[in-house]
């Protein structure tokens, strides 16, 4: 509840330094920028909120065209907010005949390439996120996908909780990605219990922190959680501080 300014003031009071915004969203962008300037909360990234439903890997060209429009919109919104990344899930392996791994790879690459000139013009990076889409499930695949674009305006958005499911330690994903990793987020995932609160999963945080140090990562660490009011956000902040060894 409350205005965007109220929300920014709340997260600021709890120790958060930045947030990400959805694109598109029903938030007034001018109000968000004013709240950013008034509170000092950084809008560090934008999330393409249509990438699951309107996929760049869809078998229908008209759907892919619409998905590209939303990706470009996310890049434009990121520039407006002063953010440096637009998060993108590039596709989903949804059908063995019409949307399989090879098709998702080829189609998503073709569409993302169309957005790279705009990303370069705006100075905003397309940040590819790894999720449960049955597409990129190993560090080697992630590296190969990113490197195939040969662009400084595309990198990896690594979710270390999502990838626990696939068997390779999050720290090893990070080491493999190296400087390709432009953003980093997490929640909490346990192999035996599923989604859990931050810090109660199987991420192996000492190893994750060691890996982040080894690759020289000093960017944003984002909690991808549902949030809530002051009580819930305070708990998130305390958990983040604990696992990141900030307190």
Spans of model-derived segments:
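A short alpha-helix capping/helix-coil boundary motif
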Residues: 10-13, 52-55, 93-96, 123-124, ...
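Active-site beta-loop-alpha junctions enriched in small/polar residues
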Residues: 22-24, 48-51, 91-93, 129-133, ...
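Residue-level detector of anion-binding/catalytic polar loops
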Residues: 17-18, 42, 84, 125, ...
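Active-site-proximal flexible loops/turns
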Residues: 27, 52-55, 94-96, 136, ...
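Active-site acidic/histidine proton-transfer and metal-coordination neighborhood
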Residues: 57-156, 165
